């Protein structure tokens, strides 16, 4: 079906931060399957572990205990504030799970009041109907009305707008059951959450007995220079969702929760493929290799290098670049609307053998593999410099 505007290219192989097309042209990959290929392409350890797993068992369903799933669950909970995990196959599924969880929590605690879920303007939570309804971008929702009701939207990083919604719901016999929000808005324009905002958000959720669930589909698993995006904010959520980088290019999603939010019972929710042995082995390998190779430190260092390079580009091309923002290896250059657009720059980068991806607000988004090297960041910056010189 015609659901993608694709580049007219097919890649035949990849290694680390590089991809090769059928003609042998090499591309530096600063997209990483949209923040997904954490260990890069064709990682030796991941390849070996998954080859071994294929010779054992791939899928049996959640009718039975799954050793790899149990190992992954222990690993994730030992490394985070969460105590329990539900596994699925994607970010949209993980966020659908979170929405169902918030709704059930509300029905248990709201004492008959209408249940409301808060989400942020410019957010992105997925393409399935509930996740789409929670997404604060009308351009994605157009044509799919009526959306699921019960969502209200606040301005990201603006606590006054959150407080106003809590007060309005209180006066209208409604109850905010939970808040679903990204620690750093990816599709919305690579906008990091502020510590002050999230501290206030945590406090008001506690005051009103509302769940705070973070969408870490794009920010989790080391992407920001911390293992979890919430670690940059000085708070702990009641739960958070993962996907993308968790599987290193293999389909897996997860909803992790503290005990307070561990309210699903058998039959409440399920996934046929969720947490299958193959996907869990991929995720276990990604987490283990991130720890073994100290990849989080690389993300921090390369993020600092990238940010410094963006600062230099901003000074050199002030008419083109109006700002930079991001954390670790999820960063964006804000392009001046009057001069160029991010899609045009994406196309020019493609011609020069550099893969980047646009984000909202006319932003060129950079989300390379977490293993990208110092030399490769310099190549990336040189290619961007060349593009801006030609504009």
Task: List PLM regions with ranges.
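Conserved N-terminal phosphate-binding loop of PLP-dependent enzymes in the Aspartate aminotransferase
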Residues: 1-391
């Amino acid at each position: 079906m015609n659901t993608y505007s694709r580049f007219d290219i097919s890649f035949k192989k990849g290694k680390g931060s590089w991809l090769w097309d059928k003609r042998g042209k090499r591309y530096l990959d600063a997209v990483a399957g949209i923040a997904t290929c954490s260990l890069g392409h064709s990682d030796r350890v991941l390849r070996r572990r998954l080859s071994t797993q294929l010779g054992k068992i791939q899928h049996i369903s959640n009718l039975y205990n799954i050793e790899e799933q149990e190992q992954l669950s222990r690993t994730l909970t030992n490394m985070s504030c969460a105590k329990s995990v539900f596994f699925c196959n994607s970010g949209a599924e993980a966020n659908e799970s979170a929405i169902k969880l918030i709704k059930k929590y509300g029905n248990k605690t709201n004492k008959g009041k209408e249940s409301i879920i808060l989400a942020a303007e410019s957010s992105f939570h997925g393409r399935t109907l509930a996740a789409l309804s929670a997404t604060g971008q009308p351009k994605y929702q157009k044509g799919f009305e009526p959306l699921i009701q019960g969502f209200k939207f606040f301005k990201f990083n603006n606590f006054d707008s959150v407080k106003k919604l809590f007060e309005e719901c209180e006066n209208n016999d409604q109850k905010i059951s939970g808040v679903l929000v990204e620690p750093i808005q990816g599709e919305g324009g690579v906008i990091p959450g502020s510590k002050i905002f999230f501290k206030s958000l945590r406090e008001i959720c506690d005051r009103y007995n509302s769940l705070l669930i973070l969408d870490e589909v794009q920010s989790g698993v080391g992407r920001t220079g911390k293992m979890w995006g919430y670690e940059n904010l000085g708070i702990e959520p009641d739960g958070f969702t993962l996907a993308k980088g968790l599987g290193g290019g293999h389909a897996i999603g997860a909803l992790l929760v503290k005990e307070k939010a561990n309210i699903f019972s058998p039959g409440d929710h399920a996934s046929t493929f969720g947490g299958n042995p193959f996907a869990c082995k991929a995720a276990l390998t990604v987490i283990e290799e991130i720890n073994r190779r100290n990849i989080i430190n690389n993300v921090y260092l390369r993020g600092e290098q990238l940010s410094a390079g963006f600062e230099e580009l901003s000074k050199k091309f002030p008419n083109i670049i109006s700002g930079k923002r991001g954390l670790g290896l999820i960063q964006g250059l804000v392009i001046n609307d009057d001069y160029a657009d991010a899609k045009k720059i994406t196309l020019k980068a493609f011609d020069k053998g550099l893969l980047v991806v646009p984000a909202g607000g006319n932003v060129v988004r950079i989300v390379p593999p977490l293993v990208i090297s110092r030399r490769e960041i310099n190549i990336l910056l040189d290619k961007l410099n060349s593009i801006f010189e030609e504009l």
